[in-house]
Regions:
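Catalytic cores of secreted/periplasmic or lumenal enzymes
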Residues: 1-262
């Protein structure tokens, strides 16, 4: 917020930003939206991405999220943010801020400090961070994309729709629900499922004393997750869920997204 850079202005369409390490695989999501952009050229990329995010969440069983429109697109890749301002899943962590965000952080083993540094800058608070992380209930991690997965395929992904394999955070990784949070609670109680992905920045949500109450609240009440738009700065969250929803969608879900946008 204090840098007046970044934000929802469609810069992900530029190769410069798609080339950032944290965005590996997002060319697939952008590619899915290109035919819609061509059909409706007057809609901005920024609005289209937000619409796709909302439609994808709804198609996955999540809430219907109201949207506001009128975002303007960046005119060139000169407006692409500096690489390194997104969070990592495991240490050692980079600074993720300032003029050299890819440089090692002095607290490069502190999971909670890392994600707070990233998301406080965006104006989010601890409750928002936990809610945002809940987007991991949808989607998978692949070796040739984020590289965050521990396994190339699991019981839940080896025969899934779309690209086979990868590792998901939940068993039903095309459903928008609170399983991500119940998985973290299970893990904290010793109920481990090695087929499910758990990053260091996931697990800290159930161990950090300030994150933990929100994680437990979402784990206890599915409806809290389905009312996420009332509990969080939802427009800040939508564009970050798009990767999971669009890149991991089945054909039925993709068609629903397109029908919502067309």
């Amino acid at each position: 917020m204090h840098t007046n850079t970044g934000g929802a202005k469609g810069t992900i369409r530029f190769d410069k930003e798609l080339g950032h390490g944290a965005n590996a695989g997002l060319q697939n999501a952008v590619g899915m939206l290109e035919p819609i952009k061509e059909k409706y050229p007057d809609i901005s990329w920024a609005d289209l991405i937000q619409m796709a995010s909302a439609a994808g969440i709804e198609a996955a069983g999540g809430p219907k999220i109201p949207l506001r429109f009128g975002r303007r697109d960046a005119e060139s890749d000169n407006e692409v943010p500096t690489e390194g301002r997104l969070p990592e899943g495991d240490p050692p962590y980079h600074q993720a801020d300032g003029e050299t965000p890819l440089h090692a952080a002095t607290d490069n083993q502190d999971h909670a400090a890392h994600i707070r540094r990233v998301f406080y800058r965006m104006g989010l608070n601890d409750k928002d961070i936990v809610a945002l992380s809940g987007g991991h209930t949808v989607g998978r991690a692949h070796s040739n994309r984020s590289g965050a997965n521990r396994k190339d395929a699991t019981l839940y992904t080896e025969n899934g729709p779309g690209t086979k394999g990868g590792q998901s955070w939940t068993e039903n990784w095309l459903e928008f629900d609170n399983r991500y949070f119940t998985m973290l609670k299970d893990e904290s109680e010793g109920k481990t499922n090695d087929d499910l992905l758990k990053l260091s920045t996931d697990y800290v949500l159930i161990t950090d004393p300030d994150f933990k109450p929100y994680t437990e609240a979402y784990a206890a009440d599915k409806d809290k997750v389905c009312k996420i738009e009332h509990q969080t700065k939802y427009e800040s969250i939508l564009s970050r869920i798009i990767a999971a929803v669009l890149c991991s969608s089945s054909r039925t879900t993709r068609n629903h997204i397109r029908s919502c946008l067309s």
